[in-house]
């Protein structure tokens, strides 16, 4: 009969419809289970937070029951269920508790952040102080404390430097001690005022609170201005440190160049002294040859005078001519060497003078 009434729906379509309905019901069940799970978590948190109060209420209720245990068995299960108003109240209490925890956590995190900022600021100040001390030590001891005669650092300057630093530290300690004493006095005075107001029951009036707000804004503005100045000083210090580093590098390069020029000058001086020795040696040889030439010229004149009337022998004449040619050739070679040595000497003198001028600059 059903097939006659609904001929268009087959058995397979009917099964598909049934499966779809079951899937929808299952999805609704999952949603209900998720809601119940969240409610249970909320109630567990409420019980954990109010466990002591609930235990006291249970003890009081058990004392009141007394002999009515049989009646309790017949209590309707509906009385054990929470109403929507009770659920709302529990949820509201848990929300307030969670909000309070968040506020407390925010306050603690702000306190920790302020502490970390103070530590960071103190660390930056310490780093700046260390850099300044290192710069002063390098300027006054490593550079200015070197003895020009021995090339070593004088111990007296080191002792004087550290004594001066110790005096500065003592003065700083005294300054901070005085500041700490003043702050302790102010804290003690403020605590006494607060205690007096608490004893008198005098609360802060609106105008006092407004005045405190104005002062707080003023101090916050001053702190911001000082922080900006401190940041600018830090940037300037970093820039100066970088410039100093670059200048040190340039100074090192110039010193290396100076050492190289000094080495070149030493080598050139050695060459000049060697050339001077060669020139002296050549001059001695030249002088000797000149003497020999003069002697030869005299001998030649004597020979010519003695043999003006005689015919000279051919072999002696050839020997004299050969010896004369050798002497002339030796003289020419020596004169050429003298010219070369003089040119080298002049060149070396020019190089030495230019090196001395560069060293004076």
Swiss-Prot record:
Disruption phenotype: Mutants swimming speed is reduced compared to wild-type with trajectories wavy and kinky. Cilia length is not affected. It is found in: Cell projection, Cilium. The keyword Coiled coil applies. Pfam families: CCDC113_CCDC96_CC (PF13870). GO terms for biological process: cilium assembly. Keywords: Cell projection, Cilium biogenesis/degradation, Coiled coil. Its main location: other. GO terms for cellular component: axoneme; ciliary basal body. In complex with CFAP263, acts as a regulator of ciliary beating that connects radial spoke 3 (RS3) to the inner dynein arm (IDA) and the nexin-dynein regulatory complex (N-DRC). The complex is positioned parallel to N-DRC and forms a connection between the arch at the base of RS3, the IDA tail and N-DRC. Forms a complex with CFAP184; the interaction is required for functional activity in cilia. Belongs to the CFAP263 family. This is Cilia- and flagella-associated protein 263. The gene is CFAP263.
């Amino acid at each position: 009969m059903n097939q006659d009434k609904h001929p268009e729906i087959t058995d397979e379509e009917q099964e598909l419809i049934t499966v779809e309905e079951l899937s929808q019901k299952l999805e609704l069940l999952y949603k209900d289970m998720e809601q119940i799970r969240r409610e249970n978590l909320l109630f567990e948190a409420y019980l954990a937070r109010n466990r002591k109060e609930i235990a006291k209420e249970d003890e009081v209720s058990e004392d009141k029951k007394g002999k009515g245990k049989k009646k309790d068995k017949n209590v309707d299960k509906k009385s054990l269920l929470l109403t929507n108003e009770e659920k709302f109240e529990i949820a509201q209490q848990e929300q307030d508790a969670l909000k309070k925890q968040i506020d407390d956590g925010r306050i603690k995190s702000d306190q920790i952040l302020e502490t970390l900022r103070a530590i960071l600021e103190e660390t930056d100040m310490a780093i700046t102080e260390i850099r300044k001390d290192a710069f002063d030590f390098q300027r006054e001891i490593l550079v200015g404390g070197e003895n020009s005669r021995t090339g070593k650092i004088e111990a007296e300057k080191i002792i004087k430097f550290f004594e001066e630093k110790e005096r500065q530290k003592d003065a700083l300690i005294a300054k901070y001690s005085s500041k700490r004493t003043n702050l302790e006095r102010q804290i003690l005075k403020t605590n006494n005022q607060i205690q007096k107001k608490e004893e008198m029951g005098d609360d802060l009036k609106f105008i006092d609170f407004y005045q405190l707000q104005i002062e707080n804004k003023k101090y916050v503005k001053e702190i911001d201005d000082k922080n900006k100045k401190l940041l600018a000083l830090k940037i300037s210090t970093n820039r100066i440190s970088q410039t100093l580093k670059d200048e040190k590098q340039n100074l090192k390069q110039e010193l290396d160049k100076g050492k190289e020029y000094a080495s070149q000058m030493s080598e050139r001086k050695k060459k000049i002294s060697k050339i001077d020795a060669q020139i002296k040696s050549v001059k001695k040889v030249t002088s000797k040859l000149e003497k020999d030439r003069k002697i030869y010229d005299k001998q030649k004149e004597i020979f010519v005078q003695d043999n003006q009337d005689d015919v000279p022998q051919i072999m002696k004449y050839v020997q004299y001519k050969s010896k004369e040619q050798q002497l002339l050739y030796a003289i020419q070679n020596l004169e050429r060497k003298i010219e070369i040595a003089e040119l080298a000497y002049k060149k070396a003198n020019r190089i030495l003078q230019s090196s001395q001028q560069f060293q004076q600059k």
